[in-house]
Amino acid sequence: MKLPIYLDYSATTPVDPRVAQKMIDCLTVEGNFGNPASRSHVFGWKAEEAVENARRQVADLVNADPREIVWTSGATESNNLAIKGVAHFYASKGKHLITSKVEHKAVLDTTRQLEREGFEVTYIEPGEDGLITPAMIEAALRDDTILVSIMHVNNEIGTINDIAAIGELTRSRGVLFHVDGAQSTGKVEIDLASLKVDLMSFSAHKTYGPKGIGALYVSRKPRVRLEATMHGGGHERGMRSGTLATHQIVGMGEAFRIAKEEMAAENVRIKALSDRFFKQVENLEELYVNGSLTARVPHNLNLSFNYVEGESLIMALKDLAVSSGSACTSASLEPSYVLRALGRNDELAHSSIRFTFGRFSTEEEIDYAAQKVCEAVTRLRTLSPLWDMFKDGVDISKIEWAAH
Protein backbone atom coordinates (compact mmCIF):
# COMPACT_ATOMS: atom_id res chain seq x y z
CA MET A 1 0.00 0.00 0.00
CA LYS A 2 1.36 3.40 -1.04
CA LEU A 3 0.98 6.54 1.07
CA PRO A 4 -0.60 9.07 0.93
CA ILE A 5 -3.99 7.50 0.19
CA TYR A 6 -6.26 9.34 -2.25
CA LEU A 7 -9.80 9.70 -0.89
CA ASP A 8 -10.82 12.84 -2.78
CA TYR A 9 -12.34 11.38 -5.95
CA SER A 10 -15.04 14.07 -6.06
CA ALA A 11 -12.34 16.73 -6.52
CA THR A 12 -10.83 14.90 -9.47
CA THR A 13 -10.09 11.37 -10.60
CA PRO A 14 -6.85 10.00 -12.03
CA VAL A 15 -7.00 9.32 -15.76
CA ASP A 16 -7.65 5.63 -16.42
CA PRO A 17 -4.55 4.13 -18.13
CA ARG A 18 -6.75 2.94 -21.02
CA VAL A 19 -7.85 6.54 -21.53
CA ALA A 20 -4.31 7.91 -21.37
CA GLN A 21 -3.18 5.49 -24.08
CA LYS A 22 -5.94 6.60 -26.45
CA MET A 23 -4.99 10.24 -25.82
CA ILE A 24 -1.30 9.69 -26.55
CA ASP A 25 -2.27 8.26 -29.94
CA CYS A 26 -3.66 11.70 -30.92
CA LEU A 27 -0.64 13.87 -30.16
CA THR A 28 2.52 13.15 -32.13
CA VAL A 29 3.43 13.13 -35.81
CA GLU A 30 2.95 9.34 -35.97
CA GLY A 31 -0.53 9.71 -34.47
CA ASN A 32 -3.87 11.35 -35.20
CA PHE A 33 -2.74 14.97 -34.67
CA GLY A 34 -4.72 16.81 -37.39
CA ASN A 35 -7.20 19.64 -36.91
CA PRO A 36 -10.73 18.16 -37.04
CA ALA A 37 -11.86 21.29 -38.92
CA SER A 38 -9.34 20.73 -41.76
CA ARG A 39 -11.61 19.51 -44.56
CA SER A 40 -9.07 19.31 -47.38
CA HIS A 41 -6.85 16.39 -46.33
CA VAL A 42 -6.77 13.02 -44.61
CA PHE A 43 -5.19 14.34 -41.37
CA GLY A 44 -8.28 16.47 -40.76
CA TRP A 45 -10.68 13.72 -41.81
CA LYS A 46 -9.13 11.22 -39.42
CA ALA A 47 -9.20 13.70 -36.54
CA GLU A 48 -12.84 14.54 -37.28
CA GLU A 49 -13.68 10.83 -37.35
CA ALA A 50 -12.07 10.39 -33.89
CA VAL A 51 -14.00 13.39 -32.54
CA GLU A 52 -17.32 12.08 -33.87
CA ASN A 53 -16.62 8.62 -32.48
CA ALA A 54 -16.03 10.18 -29.05
CA ARG A 55 -19.24 12.20 -29.41
CA ARG A 56 -21.11 8.92 -29.93
CA GLN A 57 -19.41 7.41 -26.85
CA VAL A 58 -20.45 10.34 -24.66
CA ALA A 59 -23.99 10.25 -26.08
CA ASP A 60 -24.20 6.47 -25.49
CA LEU A 61 -23.55 6.78 -21.75
CA VAL A 62 -26.49 9.17 -21.31
CA ASN A 63 -28.70 7.78 -24.13
CA ALA A 64 -28.71 10.96 -26.19
CA ASP A 65 -28.37 11.68 -29.90
CA PRO A 66 -24.69 12.44 -30.70
CA ARG A 67 -25.88 15.63 -32.43
CA GLU A 68 -27.05 16.87 -29.02
CA ILE A 69 -23.51 16.81 -27.56
CA VAL A 70 -21.51 20.05 -27.71
CA TRP A 71 -17.83 19.98 -26.67
CA THR A 72 -16.67 22.52 -24.06
CA SER A 73 -13.62 23.00 -21.84
CA GLY A 74 -15.36 21.42 -18.84
CA ALA A 75 -18.51 21.47 -16.72
CA THR A 76 -17.85 25.06 -15.59
CA GLU A 77 -18.01 26.26 -19.19
CA SER A 78 -21.00 23.99 -19.89
CA ASN A 79 -22.88 25.53 -16.96
CA ASN A 80 -22.01 29.05 -18.15
CA LEU A 81 -23.05 28.30 -21.73
CA ALA A 82 -26.32 26.66 -20.69
CA ILE A 83 -27.45 29.26 -18.15
CA LYS A 84 -26.21 32.45 -19.83
CA GLY A 85 -27.03 31.07 -23.28
CA VAL A 86 -30.67 30.40 -22.35
CA ALA A 87 -31.06 33.60 -20.32
CA HIS A 88 -29.82 35.81 -23.14
CA PHE A 89 -31.70 34.00 -25.92
CA TYR A 90 -35.04 33.84 -24.11
CA ALA A 91 -34.83 37.17 -22.22
CA SER A 92 -37.81 38.52 -24.18
CA LYS A 93 -39.97 35.69 -22.72
CA GLY A 94 -38.99 36.35 -19.11
CA LYS A 95 -36.12 37.22 -16.83
CA HIS A 96 -36.66 34.86 -13.88
CA LEU A 97 -34.48 31.82 -13.13
CA ILE A 98 -34.63 29.22 -10.35
CA THR A 99 -31.71 27.36 -8.81
CA SER A 100 -30.76 26.10 -5.34
CA LYS A 101 -28.46 27.27 -2.56
CA VAL A 102 -26.39 24.06 -2.74
CA GLU A 103 -25.35 24.23 -6.39
CA HIS A 104 -21.71 24.27 -7.48
CA LYS A 105 -20.11 27.72 -7.63
CA ALA A 106 -20.03 27.42 -11.43
CA VAL A 107 -23.83 27.69 -11.34
CA LEU A 108 -24.17 30.14 -8.43
CA ASP A 109 -21.59 32.61 -9.75
CA THR A 110 -23.18 32.43 -13.20
CA THR A 111 -26.62 33.29 -11.83
CA ARG A 112 -25.08 36.09 -9.71
CA GLN A 113 -23.65 37.56 -12.92
CA LEU A 114 -27.09 37.39 -14.55
CA GLU A 115 -28.56 39.21 -11.54
CA ARG A 116 -26.09 42.04 -12.22
CA GLU A 117 -27.47 42.11 -15.78
CA GLY A 118 -31.04 42.58 -14.54
CA PHE A 119 -32.28 38.98 -14.28
CA GLU A 120 -34.06 37.77 -11.15
CA VAL A 121 -33.00 34.51 -9.51
CA THR A 122 -34.75 32.49 -6.79
CA TYR A 123 -32.37 30.37 -4.67
CA ILE A 124 -34.21 27.39 -3.17
CA GLU A 125 -33.21 26.18 0.28
CA PRO A 126 -32.96 22.36 0.42
CA GLY A 127 -34.44 20.16 3.12
CA GLU A 128 -32.06 19.08 5.89
CA ASP A 129 -31.42 15.96 3.80
CA GLY A 130 -29.90 18.22 1.14
CA LEU A 131 -32.51 17.35 -1.49
CA ILE A 132 -34.44 19.68 -3.79
CA THR A 133 -37.99 18.45 -4.40
CA PRO A 134 -40.43 19.23 -7.24
CA ALA A 135 -42.75 20.85 -4.67
CA MET A 136 -40.03 23.35 -3.72
CA ILE A 137 -39.57 24.26 -7.38
CA GLU A 138 -43.30 24.46 -8.03
CA ALA A 139 -43.62 26.99 -5.20
CA ALA A 140 -40.95 29.17 -6.82
CA LEU A 141 -42.23 29.04 -10.44
CA ARG A 142 -43.60 32.26 -11.93
CA ASP A 143 -45.14 33.24 -15.25
CA ASP A 144 -41.84 34.82 -16.30
CA THR A 145 -39.62 31.86 -15.26
CA ILE A 146 -37.50 30.74 -18.22
CA LEU A 147 -35.01 28.30 -16.66
CA VAL A 148 -34.61 25.95 -13.69
CA SER A 149 -31.05 24.75 -12.94
CA ILE A 150 -30.65 21.91 -10.41
CA MET A 151 -27.67 19.56 -10.00
CA HIS A 152 -28.05 15.80 -10.34
CA VAL A 153 -25.51 14.72 -7.69
CA ASN A 154 -24.14 17.17 -5.13
CA ASN A 155 -20.35 17.49 -5.19
CA GLU A 156 -20.00 18.00 -1.42
CA ILE A 157 -22.54 15.62 0.11
CA GLY A 158 -23.25 13.15 -2.71
CA THR A 159 -27.05 13.47 -2.59
CA ILE A 160 -29.05 12.56 -5.72
CA ASN A 161 -31.90 14.84 -6.77
CA ASP A 162 -34.95 13.35 -8.48
CA ILE A 163 -34.37 15.06 -11.82
CA ALA A 164 -36.99 12.86 -13.52
CA ALA A 165 -39.76 14.27 -11.31
CA ILE A 166 -38.44 17.84 -11.56
CA GLY A 167 -38.29 17.49 -15.35
CA GLU A 168 -41.93 16.37 -15.54
CA LEU A 169 -42.90 19.55 -13.67
CA THR A 170 -40.79 21.97 -15.71
CA ARG A 171 -41.83 20.44 -19.06
CA SER A 172 -45.52 20.67 -18.09
CA ARG A 173 -45.01 24.38 -17.36
CA GLY A 174 -43.01 25.13 -20.49
CA VAL A 175 -39.89 26.06 -18.50
CA LEU A 176 -36.44 24.92 -19.63
CA PHE A 177 -34.55 22.58 -17.26
CA HIS A 178 -30.75 22.51 -16.95
CA VAL A 179 -28.98 19.82 -14.91
CA ASP A 180 -25.36 19.93 -13.73
CA GLY A 181 -24.36 16.30 -14.25
CA ALA A 182 -20.63 16.67 -13.51
CA GLN A 183 -20.77 14.36 -10.47
CA SER A 184 -23.28 11.81 -11.78
CA THR A 185 -21.76 10.32 -14.95
CA GLY A 186 -20.56 6.80 -14.26
CA LYS A 187 -22.28 6.80 -10.87
CA VAL A 188 -26.01 7.10 -11.67
CA GLU A 189 -28.00 5.88 -14.69
CA ILE A 190 -28.85 8.78 -17.02
CA ASP A 191 -31.37 8.26 -19.83
CA LEU A 192 -31.87 11.54 -21.66
CA ALA A 193 -34.25 9.88 -24.12
CA SER A 194 -36.81 9.55 -21.32
CA LEU A 195 -35.78 12.35 -18.92
CA LYS A 196 -37.47 15.71 -19.48
CA VAL A 197 -34.12 17.49 -19.31
CA ASP A 198 -33.30 20.23 -21.84
CA LEU A 199 -29.64 20.86 -21.02
CA MET A 200 -27.07 18.83 -19.07
CA SER A 201 -23.44 19.58 -18.23
CA PHE A 202 -20.72 16.91 -18.21
CA SER A 203 -17.09 16.78 -17.15
CA ALA A 204 -14.41 14.25 -18.12
CA HIS A 205 -12.13 14.59 -15.10
CA LYS A 206 -14.77 13.42 -12.60
CA THR A 207 -15.10 10.20 -14.63
CA TYR A 208 -11.45 9.07 -15.05
CA GLY A 209 -10.89 11.26 -18.10
CA PRO A 210 -8.62 14.28 -18.61
CA LYS A 211 -9.09 17.76 -17.18
CA GLY A 212 -9.95 20.66 -19.47
CA ILE A 213 -12.66 18.91 -21.48
CA GLY A 214 -16.40 18.64 -20.96
CA ALA A 215 -19.64 18.64 -22.88
CA LEU A 216 -23.09 20.18 -22.86
CA TYR A 217 -26.16 18.20 -23.89
CA VAL A 218 -28.53 20.49 -25.79
CA SER A 219 -31.90 18.90 -26.56
CA ARG A 220 -33.04 18.79 -30.22
CA LYS A 221 -36.64 17.66 -29.52
CA PRO A 222 -37.95 19.91 -28.08
CA ARG A 223 -35.35 22.19 -29.60
CA VAL A 224 -33.41 24.44 -27.24
CA ARG A 225 -31.77 27.61 -28.54
CA LEU A 226 -28.68 29.20 -26.99
CA GLU A 227 -26.79 32.43 -27.44
CA ALA A 228 -23.10 31.54 -27.77
CA THR A 229 -20.67 32.83 -25.15
CA MET A 230 -17.52 31.95 -27.15
CA HIS A 231 -17.21 33.45 -30.62
CA GLY A 232 -14.87 32.48 -33.43
CA GLY A 233 -14.82 30.00 -36.27
CA GLY A 234 -18.34 28.72 -35.70
CA HIS A 235 -17.33 25.26 -34.48
CA GLU A 236 -19.91 23.02 -32.75
CA ARG A 237 -22.76 24.40 -34.90
CA GLY A 238 -21.92 27.92 -33.73
CA MET A 239 -22.55 27.13 -30.06
CA ARG A 240 -18.91 26.88 -29.03
CA SER A 241 -16.11 28.15 -31.26
CA GLY A 242 -12.51 27.03 -30.87
CA THR A 243 -10.30 24.33 -32.40
CA LEU A 244 -11.35 20.97 -30.98
CA ALA A 245 -8.76 19.31 -28.72
CA THR A 246 -8.80 15.88 -30.36
CA HIS A 247 -6.70 14.15 -27.68
CA GLN A 248 -8.86 15.41 -24.82
CA ILE A 249 -12.10 14.68 -26.65
CA VAL A 250 -10.95 11.15 -27.47
CA GLY A 251 -10.00 10.77 -23.79
CA MET A 252 -13.45 11.85 -22.65
CA GLY A 253 -15.09 9.48 -25.12
CA GLU A 254 -13.04 6.51 -23.94
CA ALA A 255 -13.65 7.42 -20.28
CA PHE A 256 -17.42 7.50 -20.87
CA ARG A 257 -17.27 4.23 -22.84
CA ILE A 258 -15.55 2.54 -19.88
CA ALA A 259 -18.05 4.12 -17.48
CA LYS A 260 -20.97 2.66 -19.45
CA GLU A 261 -19.43 -0.84 -19.47
CA GLU A 262 -18.19 -0.97 -15.89
CA MET A 263 -20.58 1.28 -13.93
CA ALA A 264 -22.84 -1.45 -12.55
CA ALA A 265 -20.00 -3.59 -11.18
CA GLU A 266 -18.01 -0.57 -10.01
CA ASN A 267 -20.94 0.84 -8.02
CA VAL A 268 -21.34 -2.47 -6.17
CA ARG A 269 -17.63 -2.51 -5.31
CA ILE A 270 -17.58 1.12 -4.16
CA LYS A 271 -20.73 0.65 -2.06
CA ALA A 272 -18.95 -2.23 -0.29
CA LEU A 273 -15.88 -0.03 0.35
CA SER A 274 -17.99 2.87 1.62
CA ASP A 275 -19.97 0.57 3.96
CA ARG A 276 -16.73 -1.00 5.16
CA PHE A 277 -15.30 2.43 6.00
CA PHE A 278 -18.45 3.64 7.75
CA LYS A 279 -18.77 0.48 9.87
CA GLN A 280 -15.31 1.18 11.31
CA VAL A 281 -15.98 4.81 12.24
CA GLU A 282 -19.71 4.82 13.09
CA ASN A 283 -19.13 4.07 16.78
CA LEU A 284 -17.37 7.40 17.29
CA GLU A 285 -19.57 9.61 19.47
CA GLU A 286 -21.17 12.74 18.03
CA LEU A 287 -20.72 11.60 14.43
CA TYR A 288 -23.14 13.00 11.85
CA VAL A 289 -23.66 11.99 8.22
CA ASN A 290 -24.38 15.05 6.08
CA GLY A 291 -27.11 14.64 3.47
CA SER A 292 -29.73 11.98 2.83
CA LEU A 293 -28.76 8.47 3.93
CA THR A 294 -30.71 6.85 1.10
CA ALA A 295 -30.71 9.23 -1.91
CA ARG A 296 -26.94 9.43 -2.28
CA VAL A 297 -24.12 7.94 -4.33
CA PRO A 298 -22.00 5.37 -2.45
CA HIS A 299 -18.84 7.18 -3.57
CA ASN A 300 -19.36 10.06 -1.14
CA LEU A 301 -19.37 10.07 2.67
CA ASN A 302 -19.51 13.56 4.15
CA LEU A 303 -19.13 13.26 7.92
CA SER A 304 -19.12 15.81 10.74
CA PHE A 305 -17.10 14.94 13.84
CA ASN A 306 -18.52 17.26 16.50
CA TYR A 307 -15.98 19.03 18.78
CA VAL A 308 -13.18 18.44 16.27
CA GLU A 309 -12.11 21.28 13.96
CA GLY A 310 -12.15 20.01 10.38
CA GLU A 311 -8.91 21.71 9.36
CA SER A 312 -7.10 20.26 12.42
CA LEU A 313 -8.42 16.82 11.52
CA ILE A 314 -7.21 17.16 7.93
CA MET A 315 -3.74 18.10 9.24
CA ALA A 316 -3.79 15.15 11.64
CA LEU A 317 -4.70 12.83 8.74
CA LYS A 318 -1.57 13.74 6.80
CA ASP A 319 -1.46 10.35 5.02
CA LEU A 320 -5.03 10.76 3.72
CA ALA A 321 -6.01 13.06 0.87
CA VAL A 322 -9.47 14.24 1.96
CA SER A 323 -11.20 17.60 1.86
CA SER A 324 -13.48 19.86 3.83
CA GLY A 325 -16.08 21.11 1.40
CA SER A 326 -15.58 21.35 -2.35
CA ALA A 327 -12.11 21.49 -3.88
CA CYS A 328 -13.02 24.71 -5.66
CA THR A 329 -13.79 26.58 -2.43
CA SER A 330 -11.82 24.72 0.27
CA ALA A 331 -9.08 27.37 0.31
CA SER A 332 -11.46 29.72 2.15
CA LEU A 333 -11.95 29.18 5.87
CA GLU A 334 -15.66 29.91 5.69
CA PRO A 335 -17.78 26.93 6.75
CA SER A 336 -19.24 25.06 3.78
CA TYR A 337 -22.18 26.98 2.30
CA VAL A 338 -23.74 23.63 1.37
CA LEU A 339 -23.75 22.40 4.98
CA ARG A 340 -25.03 25.78 6.20
CA ALA A 341 -27.92 25.49 3.72
CA LEU A 342 -28.76 22.08 5.26
CA GLY A 343 -29.20 23.86 8.59
CA ARG A 344 -25.95 22.60 10.14
CA ASN A 345 -24.58 25.04 12.71
CA ASP A 346 -21.13 26.60 12.23
CA GLU A 347 -19.47 24.11 14.59
CA LEU A 348 -20.80 21.04 12.77
CA ALA A 349 -20.14 22.61 9.37
CA HIS A 350 -16.56 23.36 10.43
CA SER A 351 -16.04 19.80 11.68
CA SER A 352 -16.98 18.13 8.40
CA ILE A 353 -14.73 16.01 6.20
CA ARG A 354 -15.61 14.68 2.76
CA PHE A 355 -14.35 11.16 2.04
CA THR A 356 -14.84 10.15 -1.59
CA PHE A 357 -13.97 6.70 -2.92
CA GLY A 358 -13.29 5.58 -6.47
CA ARG A 359 -12.02 3.12 -9.05
CA PHE A 360 -8.54 2.68 -7.57
CA SER A 361 -9.49 2.59 -3.85
CA THR A 362 -8.69 -0.72 -2.11
CA GLU A 363 -9.93 -2.47 1.03
CA GLU A 364 -6.46 -2.14 2.56
CA GLU A 365 -6.54 1.64 2.04
CA ILE A 366 -10.05 1.90 3.47
CA ASP A 367 -9.11 -0.03 6.63
CA TYR A 368 -5.99 2.08 7.15
CA ALA A 369 -7.96 5.31 6.63
CA ALA A 370 -10.71 4.32 9.05
CA GLN A 371 -8.18 3.42 11.74
CA LYS A 372 -6.36 6.76 11.29
CA VAL A 373 -9.64 8.70 11.48
CA CYS A 374 -10.67 6.99 14.73
CA GLU A 375 -7.24 7.61 16.28
CA ALA A 376 -7.10 11.27 15.19
CA VAL A 377 -10.65 12.14 16.31
CA THR A 378 -10.12 10.50 19.70
CA ARG A 379 -6.77 12.26 20.19
CA LEU A 380 -8.02 15.71 19.12
CA ARG A 381 -11.01 15.43 21.42
CA THR A 382 -8.78 14.72 24.42
CA LEU A 383 -7.21 18.13 23.71
CA SER A 384 -10.57 19.91 23.50
CA PRO A 385 -12.00 21.64 26.61
CA LEU A 386 -15.37 21.77 24.83
CA TRP A 387 -15.36 17.97 24.56
CA ASP A 388 -14.69 17.72 28.32
CA MET A 389 -17.60 20.06 29.03
CA PHE A 390 -19.87 18.08 26.70
CA LYS A 391 -18.88 14.83 28.46
CA ASP A 392 -19.66 16.50 31.80
CA GLY A 393 -23.19 17.18 30.59
CA VAL A 394 -22.82 20.91 29.95
CA ASP A 395 -25.09 22.23 27.17
CA ILE A 396 -22.51 24.25 25.27
CA SER A 397 -25.12 26.03 23.13
CA LYS A 398 -26.48 27.68 26.29
CA ILE A 399 -23.14 29.14 27.39
CA GLU A 400 -22.78 32.89 26.98
CA TRP A 401 -19.17 33.57 26.10
CA ALA A 402 -18.01 36.93 27.44
CA ALA A 403 -15.76 39.08 25.29
CA HIS A 404 -12.52 40.27 26.89
Swiss-Prot record:
List, alphabetically, the GO terms of the cellular component aspect. L-cysteine desulfurase complex
| UniProt-listed InterPro entries | Aminotrans_V_dom, Aminotrans_V_PyrdxlP_BS, Cys_deSase_IscS, Cysteine_dSase, PyrdxlP-dep_Trfase, PyrdxlP-dep_Trfase_major, PyrdxlP-dep_Trfase_small
Cofactor entry: pyridoxal 5'-phosphate
Could you tell me one molecular function GO term of this UniProt entry? Answer: 2 iron, 2 sulfur cluster binding
Residues modified as N6-(pyridoxal phosphate)lysine: 206
Entries under Gene3D superfamilies matching the protein:
Aspartate Aminotransferase, domain 1, Type I PLP-dependent aspartate aminotransferase-like (Major domain)
**Which principal EC class is assigned to this enzyme?**
transferase
Active site per the UniProt annotation: 328
Which residues does the record give as pyridoxal 5'-phosphate binding sites? 75-76, 155, 183, 203-205, 243
Q: Cite the entry's keywords alphabetically.
A: 2Fe-2S, Cytoplasm, Iron, Iron-sulfur, Metal-binding, Pyridoxal phosphate, Transferase
The catalytic activity of this protein is classed by the Enzyme Commission as: 2.8.1.7
Instruction: Provide the binding site for [2Fe-2S] cluster.
Output: 328
Reaction catalysed by this chain? (sulfur carrier)-H + L-cysteine = (sulfur carrier)-SH + L-alanine
Under the heading Pfam families, the entry gives: Aminotran_5
Pathway of this protein? Cofactor biosynthesis; iron-sulfur cluster biosynthesis
One of this protein's GO BP terms? Answer: [2Fe-2S] cluster assembly
Where is this protein chiefly located? cytoplasm
Q: Function, please?
A: Master enzyme that delivers sulfur to a number of partners involved in Fe-S cluster assembly, tRNA modification or cofactor biosynthesis. Catalyzes the removal of elemental sulfur atoms from cysteine to produce alanine. Functions as a sulfur delivery protein for Fe-S cluster synthesis onto IscU, an Fe-S scaffold assembly protein, as well as other S acceptor proteins.
Q: How does it assemble?
A: Homodimer. Forms a heterotetramer with IscU, interacts with other sulfur acceptors.
The protein's name: Cysteine desulfurase IscS
Encoding gene, per UniProt annotation: iscS
